[in-house]
Amino acid sequence: MHLQHFRSGVRRRATPALCLALVAIAAQAGAVPALAAHPHATMQQVLAASRPSDWRSLDPAQTLVMTLPQGRVVIELAAQFAPRHVANIEALARAHFFDGLTINRVQDDFVTQWGDADSDLPAKARPLPADARAALPDEYQRSAVGLDFARLPDGDVYAPQVGFADGFPVGRDPRTDTAWLLHCYGMVGVGRDNPPDNGSGAELYAVIGQAPRQLDRNITVVGRVVAGMHLLAALPRGGGNLGFYRDPAHRTRILGVRLASELPRAERPRLEVLRTGTATFAALIAARRDRSESWFVRPAGRISVCNVPLPVRVAPAPKP
């Protein structure tokens, strides 16, 4: 997979009314009544005032657990955006395809990539399981119809509109009524070669640097790392071209990749993700757009989509 690095950004100023708009929405919805009189609440205060219904548990059937020597990486899959690729990845996981393969590329401020290092060598490449496909149509975007899209009020360089849906950062074009996942930090995509190759999911990567948004709608994005991101971001950088390791001994071995639904219940990740369609999430965005902490001299009054935190927490222990 050939991914090129590029940076771009803009800075604009918001009015006080716009800065308070999301807090007003949140207060009207009643999800954070304790914050209604405090438009300058911090993110920590917003989360502390959240309700159990503001959070959702990960679906074990849509959750990948990748075990490395350093620990576990948990990935929430986005079948609602890339159903064919996600189904293929699930087939690969059920067949234990990734077990014993390696992390082959760590490019600074860009991606960590894993899969079969010998995939380009027919004599050495690991065969795909019978129920997995080697070629799939692209899933770079989908219809926006029926999508619970929480639009961010600030502008964007790459998309007409940006926001969040089902816990993922999303771009939307109202003219074509299409939506797509964004290449924010922690997002997971499918490695591919030049078109017409669209990747099968046998080679995956996670964004570990500044969001490479020029990749949006050029690669199928299949999910987001919700735990263990530090394990992927802290790996030694590859010294070869595009961050690939020159020495195979420097690669990190993958001990296993499983769907959480295949793990014993006691070994499944007990994680909850903040719902992005809630007033609590709207209040969180407002808190991050207009930073009220005493450290800030000039709060920005706006925020880019990839700078909005998507909180994950360990699920509270069940009451006896």
Regions flagged by a language model, labelled:
Residues 1-11:
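N-terminal secretory signal peptides that target proteins for export/translocation
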Residues 2, 30-320:
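Cyclophilin-like peptidyl-prolyl cis-trans isomerases
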Residues 11, 24-26, 33:
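N-terminal non-cleavable signal-anchor helices
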Residues 16-28:
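Bacterial N-terminal signal peptides
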